[in-house]
Amino acid sequence: RTAPSAHPRAHVLTARTLEICEDLGLGDALRQIAPPLERWRRFRYCDRVDGADYAVADHGAAPAWANLEAASDQRVQHISQPVFEALLRRAVADADVETRYGRRVVDVGLGGDGVACVLDDGATLDAEYLVAADGPRGAAAGVVLAAATDAADRVPGVAHHLDAPALQHFVSVAFRSRDLAARLRARPAMLYFVFNQETTSVVVAHNLDEGLFNLQFPVFPPAERPGDAAAPRNVRREVRALTAAPLADLKIESARPWLMRARLADRFALDSHRAFLVGDAAHEMPPSGGFGMNTAVGDAHNLAWKLARASAGAANGRDLLASYERERRPAAAANVALSVDNWRRGLLIPEALGLPPRALDLAKVAAPTSAAFKTTTAAARAAVLARAATPHVGVTEVVAGRRELPLFFPHHDLGLRYDGASARAAA
């Protein structure tokens, strides 16, 4: 990338992440940009974002909120990842940090006393340590994974990575509309789960003041091709299906297909303790619950001070670096498992409406082309919703029983502790 991505992605900062930010002196800045709780405390399950609700989950009234308040002076916040990252970049602007854009690592040499990173322009960077935070298919991460326990070998880093099967294909759409923001001020929410004849999708209200939203809708290969689903004409059709009336000022900012995976690297570090995996390079998980970015922050916080001590020549520096994988891998494993469970809980709502995911799998077989698939699924949605005289009843039961996707997770957020070779959620 030649510049940071402005595409909205993660948007929930947990209490633990905010505690870390407070320690770094970023607490006041985050509180200034955070929207009020009233705007994002709810999840709405609806036929249109500006239409009728099947049910509303008010997480601000959930027992978990009180548990978090009792455990920490920090509160969960709803802040878009690009906004959070911009704040972090400003915080290090005056530090001894050099940021380069438009460069890619193509090879890494691993040795007992350091690392050498070769860039795509031919330049070589020598360093004591390598932190591979370049995502699940990054070159630096590939080297760490491919090198396994033999850190002395110089392994090309481009073609080495562990793939995991996709749980689901999606298209993510960033769009702006002050018209939509005005319609939603009387019915605010963080997430709008939309179920109607034209679409089954989720809308994230990132910023009502600026009219910034993110739409996530599923794609079902081979009946649908992700690239075609992200094409402008189809994206506009999906956005149009969200509202009762067309938006007067719709602006599509960006659209990109992506794969939802659940993956955990076998190793987070090499035995030489010269190279480490952090964030998505080490683990991928469904966005359900918002653990991806927060787990990455926990990784970075755990590793940063240990690297500082080791680089300064601390006598126990090697032992500290060895503890990174021992502490963070079990923590990440727990969050991956919870995120998968949350994703499955989220499927209870369409099932309550008579739209089980299995029906879409069958539709892929019955309608192997994109046009036929859309026709088949639209007809199925219409038939199911028409048959359900009171479609909200099943959804209300799921929400009233708190079986839907939660927003707060006190045990996983603040209850995690490191205990020797394991990490677990404290009661």
Where are the regions that the model predicts?
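Core beta-strand elements of the Rossmann-like FAD/NAD(P) dinucleotide-binding domain
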Residues: 120-129, 271
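Short glycine/proline-rich turn/loop motifs
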Residues: 64-75, 215-222, 258, 283-284
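C-terminal helical "tail/cap" subdomain of flavin- and related membrane-associated enzymes
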Residues: 308-426
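General small-molecule cofactor/ligand-binding pocket signal
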Residues: 31, 98-100, 251-253
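A conserved short coil-to-beta-strand element within the FAD-binding core of flavoproteins
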Residues: 101-115
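Conserved mid-domain beta->alpha element of the FAD-binding
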Residues: 21, 88, 132, 252, ...
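Conserved FAD-binding catalytic core of PHBH/FMO-like flavoproteins
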Residues: 90, 129, 133-260
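Active-site-adjacent segment of FAD-dependent monooxygenases/related oxidoreductases
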Residues: 6-93, 194-197, 206, 336
